[in-house]
Design a protein with these regions (language model features):
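N-terminal first-folded block
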Residues: 3-43
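Feature captures the catalytic cores and cofactor-binding loops of soluble hydro-lyases/lyases
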Residues: 23, 33-44, 49-111
Length: 111
């Protein structure tokens, strides 16, 4: 499933980046030091930690997309840094659990 397909199914708003990337897994985490060693290339990273350091972690780990859940505010400077580093950012009003359940259900037999 691509980021664009996930956005459609999950009701995500893609704010910047390449939504054609394939999603190869999911990681949920907010502690950025932990995320640096757990977010994997191509994953959908779900978090509420909407600060510019999340973009730095994504630049190191290369997820398909960072999804900021619970409708957290995303500052323009963070979006600008994401654009500069080719990081895809989306947001959702759902919480992390609801996003994971919806993503799992959308995968059907592939999960």
């Amino acid at each position: 499933m691509t980021v664009a397909e996930a956005a459609k199914v999950l009701g995500l708003t893609v704010l910047c980046g390449d939504d054609s990337r394939e999603i190869e897994g999911v990681y949920v985490g907010d502690l950025l030091s932990r995320c640096m060693s757990r977010v994997t290339e191509g994953c959908l990273w779900i978090t509420i930690m909407s600060n510019i350091n999340a973009v730095a972690v994504a630049a190191l780990t290369d997820p398909a997309c960072i999804v900021f859940c619970e409708d957290v505010e995303i500052e323009e400077d963070m979006l600008q840094r994401a654009r500069e580093n080719d990081i895809t950012i989306a947001k959702s009003t759902l919480d992390a659990y609801a996003l994971c359940v919806a993503f799992h259900n959308s995968c059907g037999e592939k999960s």
